[in-house]
């Protein structure tokens, strides 16, 4: 995977939380750790699922922001490339050797369009989403300037209420413009229903996706009638991939969180009413935290607070234990309820974050652990790449 192996000059506890070969107990906290066995099982499972259903899987890099994790998804899970949300994020992956990059977002600022149009010079195939005909003209001009080619996905707003057009006529108009524009290629449709990914009920998610799939089918039919059949119809996430893959319309999935999982995704249910983190996917990402104070007999204070995680989707839970509970946090402190006084100062706990994506974005490194030993230390390659 071309993972970093030379850590000479790195000081543990200042530059980096751990080094390969260390015991898990020696890792400096708070930091992100990956259970490599669970991660690899998740990646293989999604790859096997996509293959069995005749689908491409393009893993979403906005979740992990790591070139090394993406390469693992490609080598173990057959991922065909990476999805990104920002130009700088796409640059981090392309510069890191990822050869197929889709920006699942609109790029409108002239300077960003210029950078996007230069990106194929790294050797990567680059595709971007569009929801406005004027954007086609700007992208074409920049690609001509740099002598590059860009792929175009027309984005449909199929319920997220964000970017994307809402009518089949608008889809056809933009696709025609892309097909006619120099240095651009119309490749397909982006149709991701983000608003329903975290709905607890399987039936509620299915109802939202049924409506989205019907909308996308109308657009596909309209394109085919104009001789513009899309090569790819792309979308789907960890909370919905089974709907898109059985739709007969989509042929590419964009799942991301399945690889790591988080507390919020764990709360949603499958068709049998089971949590999807109990059999479908495993928790592979944890915030490793240490007890720093136990001055009160029923409360332990740990070193993972707001600056170590995102709590927009709720507080983390303590993994593998029901005798202690993470109950509140401030900038640098987390408070763990310890009714029986079982914790001691310097004990380490694994926390499952409420929301993996923004939690990963506040850390510099992933520490990969197997059988209690540090095996890998990977940089969060696109950390802070929000431009």
Curated annotation (Swiss-Prot):
Its EC number is 4.1.3.41. Keywords: Lyase, Magnesium, Metal-binding, Pyridoxal phosphate. Pyridoxal 5'-phosphate binds at residues 85, 238, 256-257, 265. Pfam families: Ala_racemase_N, D-ser_dehydrat. GO terms for biological process: D-serine catabolic process; glycolate catabolic process; glyoxylate catabolic process. Its cofactor is pyridoxal 5'-phosphate; Mg(2+). Binds 1 pyridoxal phosphate per subunit. InterPro entries: Ala_racemase_N, D-amino_acid_metab_enzyme, D-ser_dehydrat-like_dom, D-ser_dehydrat-like_sf, HdxyAspAldBhcC, PLP-binding_barrel. The modification N6-(pyridoxal phosphate)lysine is found at residue 62. The keyword Magnesium applies. Gene3D superfamilies: Alanine racemase, D-serine dehydratase-like domain. GO terms for molecular function: D-serine ammonia-lyase activity; magnesium ion binding; oxo-acid-lyase activity; pyridoxal phosphate binding. CDD domains: PLPDE_III_LS_D-TA (cd06819). It catalyses: (3S)-3-hydroxy-D-aspartate = glyoxylate + glycine; (3R)-3-hydroxy-D-aspartate = glyoxylate + glycine. Mg(2+) binds at residues 355, 357. It comes from the Bacteria. Induction: Induced by glycolate. Disruption phenotype: Abolishes growth on glycolate or glyoxylate, but the deletion mutant strain is still able to grow on acetate, succinate or glucose with comparable growth rates as for the wild type. NCBIfam families: HdxyAspAldBhcC. Homodimer. The beta-hydroxyaspartate cycle (BHAC) consists of BhcA, BhcB, BhcC, and BhcD enzyme activities. Overall, it converts two molecules of glyoxylate (C2) into oxaloacetate (C4) without the loss of carbon as CO2, under consumption of just one reducing equivalent and regeneration of the catalytic amino donor, which makes it one of the most efficient glyoxylate assimilation pathways. Catalyzes the condensation of glyoxylate and glycine into (2R,3S)-beta-hydroxyaspartate ((3S)-3-hydroxy-D-aspartate). Is essential for the growth of P.denitrificans in the presence of glycolate and glyoxylate since it functions in glyoxylate assimilation via the beta-hydroxyaspartate cycle (BHAC). Is also able to catalyze the reverse reaction in vitro, i.e. the cleavage of (3S)-3-hydroxy-D-aspartate, and that of D-threonine to a lesser extent. PANTHER family: D-SERINE DEHYDRATASE, ZGC:162816-RELATED. Belongs to the DSD1 family. This is 3-hydroxy-D-aspartate aldolase. It comes from Paracoccus denitrificans (strain Pd 1222). The gene is bhcC.
